[in-house]
Amino acid sequence: MRARGIERNCQNWWKWGIMLLGILMTCSAADNLWVTVYYGVPVWKEATTTLFCASDAKSYETEAHNIWATHACVPTDPNPQEIALENVTENFNMWKNNMVEQMHEDIISLWDQSLKPCVKLTPLCVTLNCSDELRNNGTMGNNVTTEEKGMKNCSFNVTTVLKDKKQQVYALFYRLDIVPIDNDSSTNSTNYRLINCNTSAITQACPKVSFEPIPIHYCAPAGFAILKCRDKKFNGTGPCTNVSTVQCTHGIRPVVSTQLLLNGSLAEEEVIIRSENLTNNAKNIIAHLNESVKITCARPYQNTRQRTPIGLGQSLYTTRSRSIIGQAHCNISRAQWSKTLQQVARKLGTLLNKTIIKFKPSSGGDPEITTHSFNCGGEFFYCNTSGLFNSTWNISAWNNITESNNSTNTNITLQCRIKQIIKMVAGRKAIYAPPIERNILCSSNITGLLLTRDGGINNSTNETFRPGGGDMRDNWRSELYKYKVVQIEPLGVAPTRAKRRVVEREKRAIGLGAMFLGFLGAAGSTMGARSVTLTVQARQLMSGIVQQQNNLLRAIEAQQHLLQLTVWGIKQLQARILAVERYLKDQQLLGIWGCSGKHICTTNVPWNSSWSNRSLNEIWQNMTWMEWEREIDNYTGLIYSLIEESQTQQEKNEKELLELDKWASLWNWFSITQWLWYIKIFIMIIGGLIGLRIVFAVLSLVNRVRQGYSPLSFQTLLPAPRGPDRPEGTEEEGGERGRDRSVRLLNGFSALIWDDLRSLCLFSYHRLRDLILIAVRIVELLGRRGWDILKYLWNLLQYWSQELRNSASSLFDAIAIAVAEGTDRVIEIIQRACRAVLNIPRRIRQGLERSLL
């Protein structure tokens, strides 16, 4: 009875133990997530990289000496692709855009490079003896205009072919290009110098150099992309919800101008006001127009250019006569300009909450700031814009209160002056533009305004704006405001339930060597350490390649005048090398992780919930790759290092597993090193057997003591042998040999070893048999219970299937009955209606008969 109770309790324990084990296995299986590497995920990060140019220069200008050197650009894509990004919101900031800085540096480099072969005018930094030029008849009549008085006839000494000889030459200079050395203005003759001599070097533009802007497309190299904001009312800063990706920007004309933006793009709907901080009067304001205003500029023909030698092989091209000079001007439609100013004023008043918007001329400064400066046909015009910016607008009444010009004139004429010494974009150098011997006529479109705000009392209803400019970055911002460069990150990690099948250390113990010898030390540990070194070397090799390419680029930039590479050629080389570096870097990481050639690569790195505790469904069903990348961005480096360590350990395990094949060679069995291993293993086996024997003896003794057995003395004597006259089993009592008699003890080492091995094998056999019987019983019980459960579920399924069929049949019958009854009622109603209609004549006849009676 006691044995049955124990057996019954054991059965209950086994039952509950199996249930608990199943629950634990289910929970562990549900929680086990592993890191999986994905290559080609749509993830990007803000970056700064070298952009290269694309242009159709040949379709615009056949002159090969254009200052923008766009012939070195790659051809534009005839079918540019623009891919819209759905459900993507990206932040843009036109005021902190590296594309603007890069374009600014490119324009400076292009100016420097195009003027390198031209004549340096350093010898002209001498004293100029200047006076007002007289007409050919020797008199200066009253009909000399103010612009004509703006020129000086200057004489100066230059070096001849013989360096110790000086020669006096004459040339005409614009008054804006020279400054007096002394303050003596009482006489007509004073000493002057060129305006640039104390600030920057000067170079005369080559005769064949042209300044006609050609559209430039900035393109991102492989591994990078350009994001474009397509919101029609985007002001340049903040989030943009309508985002697309392009490889190149639209064609941007590098027009260098102040106050007015020329030949740019237009706003699509309404005038857009852009400023880094509109309330800060120190920040410039860019007004992006939605309709262009045409401006036409001209300068009549003059055959007045002369060649003045200034040294060995050098010449200065100057004006010989000013017969009709000074008639440069520009015309703008008054109606178009008034309409444009009205829209700009309305937008400014709305943003600043002001009712009176005033436009006034520039408050002062360099000619480049106080006038509208630009290049027209090779000459640099400086036009007075006081006629454009001299009006007041009442926002509440939507009308123009005052306007300086006479409204009867259809055009606004801007008087322009021409300068020949022009500060370059960066202000570090100057250029001397020789006079052009032809009629100059150019037409441009005003697409934007550069404004500054006076500031003052905040609670005032008035606000004054003046034309500004001077920082060419604002010109480039007006076109690049909707672009930003991002770096594509194709490598992504995310948790999945898939685990890489690897060679684990526990499984390596059941190898070929273990089958023969039982225990094997960790072989090839040195090879494993070397594998780690190889990983480090691979990374250093990649770093060396990148460093080498950077050194090459620096050398090319330093020697580009010897290699005859243009600025665009350098950028194309940088872009191509950068693309190779990006590809090699990604492939190197995939190779280190053991994922070469795979787009989805599982690992055996467990996912840590501290990186992200979101559920698997929440990650894969509700999050985009960009959102997921932002969430785990702080742990990406750690995850990468864990994947690398895991792959390194995997390679080490594989190497050790392959090293087990050396036991297949019988020749190695006779090696003295292997024999030492055999002896060591034999000693370990003998020691293990002795230890097991001692443990079993102690356990047996303890068990007998618990049952009341007293151990014998250690001085137990051997039983005395029987005599020949008393053979065994022939004593008086007869029968079997007494149980209390001692048996013969074993003598000899081999006999003891054999007896211990026999006892150990029997013990192991009995225990193993009991374990197998218990396992068979458990499997039998589980099978029986499982079969019963399956039969129960089958019966339950059949029952509910029958119930569903009965319910469906009942429902169908009820619907059929209801439809039949309804149909009968409808038919009956129709019949009654028809009878009523048919009985109408009869009722009329009966009524007439009754009335006649």
Curated annotation (Swiss-Prot):
Region (CD4-binding loop): 362-372
Annotated Basic and acidic residues bias: 723-738
A GO cellular component annotation in the UniProt record: host cell endosome membrane
SUPFAM superfamilies, per database record: gp120 core (SSF56502), Virus ectodomain (SSF58069)
Leader sequence segment: 1-31
Record PTM: Highly glycosylated by host. The high number of glycan on the protein is reffered to as 'glycan shield' because it contributes to hide protein sequence from adaptive immune system.
UniProt xrefs under CDD domains: HIV-1-like_HR1-HR2
Region annotated Disordered, chain positions: 716-738
Similarity field: Belongs to the HIV-1 env protein family.
Protein name, as recorded: Envelope glycoprotein gp160
